[in-house]
Curated annotation (Swiss-Prot):
The keyword Ribonucleoprotein applies. Keywords: Ribonucleoprotein, Ribosomal protein. Belongs to the universal ribosomal protein uL30 family. GO terms for molecular function: structural constituent of ribosome. This is Large ribosomal subunit protein uL30. Part of the 50S ribosomal subunit. It comes from Blochmanniella floridana. GO terms for cellular component: cytosolic large ribosomal subunit.
Length: 58
């Protein structure tokens, strides 16, 4: 499991990156979600890595 937290605002970013944040379930700064570690989730994380913080959750 991965614990993903949004640490930067999506204002002014590329619309595709905003959609990726929505796809991950993130809506605002400080919001945290838990996701299963899959290749598709990893790809989404790599796209918006500059706006999120990722920690491994056991």
């Amino acid at each position: 499991m991965l614990k993903i937290t949004q640490i930067r605002s999506s204002i002014g970013c590329i619309p595709k990156h905003k959609a990726t944040l929505r796809g991950l379930g993130l809506r605002r700064i400080g919001n945290t979600v838990s996701k299963i570690d899959t290749p598709s989730v990893r790809g989404m994380i790599n796209l918006v890595l500059y706006m999120i913080q990722v920690k491994r959750q056991d």
